[in-house]
Amino acid sequence: MLRTTSRTFSRALSSSNFKINCGRRHWFSVLTLLEHQGGNLSPASLSAVEAAKRTGGDVFGFVIGKDSSQISQKVAKSVNDLKKVIYVENPSYEHNIPDQIANVLFENVKKNEISHVFSAHSTVGKGVMPRLAAMFDVMQISDIIGVVSADTFVRPTYAGNVNVTVSTKDPIKIVTVRASAFDAAPSSGEGAATVVEGIDPKPAALQEWVSENIIKNARPDLSSAERVVAGGRPLKDKETFERILTPLADKLGAAIGATRVAVDSGYADNSLQIGQTGKIIAPKLYIAVGIDGAIQHLAGIKDSKVIAAINRDENAPIFQTADVGIVGDLFEIVPELTEKL
């Protein structure tokens, strides 16, 4: 097995000049940014809610953009553990321009005396939360995988080989959550949150929205798929990559992923990249086809329940992490495996 080390230290982050009137109260609230598309919540946002619950505070949801009033009502009834849902209805926020969202969040955090703001460590979260932290003059705590207490969190470093415990004395905690490290918050329809309209300062956008090209795909989303088939450099080119992996993925109902080398070589789209600089995933089954197992790639798959590797090099590092390994020619093994499924 891959040997890892765990190192813990406490870091007191610089206190902010921003003050909130909380005195010595023990009660506190955690505002969670809830991303949505097509009227549905992002699964990653439900994981952020679960992480927020573990602080011990009251968890509020924050919905912004087009149809946010309607979505908030739906969220309030469906997500079990929210106490309040705050919404800001404004179609101009539909495209999640970070400066706008951060400004709206800033005003609502101040109004509601929020002590923690959580979001998924997603494209939206990575754009909005650093800006929000700068506005409050506090340190952001990024990509957490554990909650120790209301002011202490665990996050990975060194490509996931070291887990660092970080403690902050900042009056407001700005936190992004690694979705694969937390289960989704229950959404069984037993929610009883109140819904309130938030403040809309209508900030001017510093960027202009031009266009969006959404690639429609019948496959499960790579970030949340239960099964993933991924390929690496030995697949040679884009045509071979698709010819070998697609039939297997179809049989398994799996998402398709790729290593950074495969993406850089043009075998697969950048959206399929898995690893430290790509997507962090935690499927029930991960099949690595022709992947050696660079440490940066392993950082993206280490939370998978079962890792199966196919590689002709018996000394490939991937076999130190894999639960199941097949040493052999992938061009023979994968078609045979696909045929037998």
Curated annotation (Swiss-Prot):
InterPro entries: DHS-like_NAD/FAD-binding_dom (IPR029035), ETF_a/b_N (IPR014730), ETF_a/FixB (IPR001308), ETF_alpha_N (IPR033947), ETF_asu_C (IPR014731), ETF_asu_C_CS (IPR018206), Rossmann-like_a/b/a_fold (IPR014729)
SMART domains xref list: ETF (SM00893)
UniProt-recorded Gene Ontology molecular function terms: electron transfer activity; flavin adenine dinucleotide binding
Residues binding FAD, per UniProt: 285-313
Keywords: Electron transport, FAD, Flavoprotein, Mitochondrion, Transit peptide, Transport
GO cellular component, one term: mitochondrial matrix
Cofactor: FAD
Record-linked SUPFAM superfamilies: Adenine nucleotide alpha hydrolases-like, DHS-like NAD/FAD-binding domain
Function: The electron transfer flavoprotein serves as a specific electron acceptor for several dehydrogenases, including five acyl-CoA dehydrogenases, glutaryl-CoA and sarcosine dehydrogenase. It transfers the electrons to the main mitochondrial respiratory chain via ETF-ubiquinone oxidoreductase (ETF dehydrogenase).
Protein name: Probable electron transfer flavoprotein subunit alpha, mitochondrial
